[in-house]
């Protein structure tokens, strides 16, 4: 619950999904029933490092009652776009505004790039060879891994100068092995945002609207008890410049200091969950029946996605964007029922334009909206027959007593070919889907073999 103004938290909401050309006057009209503090001056737009609108803003209101009125505007439309409204506070607002925009101290030219699409098992040496002739600083490669120690397919690389980093960007879409590699501008701050939220927020924020894993996608961190962030974000380690060289992430739970010299203990305590508007790093379902898409063409639109799933009719589509305002090639699609979400999975590996699209099911039979919190975890199938909705969170990790969650390529992969029984009952309605799961599991295992 937000504290009053006397507690220093103020009365703030965060708005997401604004049209890129949105003005303060348009925001005022959208919240015409609410009293905005200081009028247009109480509307604080969030910008990317390049100075472009991110589609998000903070709005300062005059009282808690005005906040409640503003929250009722959630999912109403502005022009052709629906707008999401979330409760926030001064601490989050001040931190985000300080760390975003073209004048942010975090946007220094420090020679970082982010790689995506690396082959599973790609080593630091292969990355060095890929950038042959371009000087990488000592300990300059960071390879995120998942909680099972496997590569996420992404990496951060720091070059000796920004000029060299610019040359590295020209290798965008070149190949390592059979995979073409995408390369994006990055920064030390982007690496840091995997696990470096304001400490105060870590203890007080309730679950918010942004939650999608992915390296370098905004100011996003999760606190779910010791070690949860390590499992979700990935442990950073490995010979050529892993965080272990800096006493970071080296005790199995991520305690210690990071490569930037800060104590990380606070990142792994509490039961809080908060995000810093990367434009799409988090998606919270209202129905509990979602499909996550990966590998979208960069020019794909919401209409393209609706057409992709035709004749199914998704409830809504959320295309993700990174902190630089560019699309990530991923999206979350919400369906009205579990059956629709399962049926949508028949489009897995189908082509959209020139690219094949991977789908990941995040749906629970019988789930409803409300407190249901959707979380995409790529390595797990989060679909439980007979589970009730309410506060059930689909992101229960392996080894936490949920027998139906099987890791692709892991020892439990054989479960994918059978029914999802256990305490949740059989799942005969999924019988036609088992073969798809087996094929996906085989594909994944062959990739990491």
From Swiss-Prot:
Sequence repeats lie at residues 234-249, 354-372, 374-392, 418-433. Gene3D superfamilies: 3.30.70.330. The modification Omega-N-methylarginine is found at residue 233. This protein is a component of the heterogeneous nuclear ribonucleoprotein (hnRNP) complexes which provide the substrate for the processing events that pre-mRNAs undergo before becoming functional, translatable mRNAs in the cytoplasm. Mediates pre-mRNA alternative splicing regulation. Inhibits, together with CUGBP1, insulin receptor (IR) pre-mRNA exon 11 inclusion in myoblast. Binds to the IR RNA. Binds poly(RG). This is Heterogeneous nuclear ribonucleoprotein H. It is found in: Nucleus, Nucleoplasm. It comes from Rattus norvegicus. The gene is Hnrnph1. Residues 11-90, 111-188, 289-364 form the RRM domain.
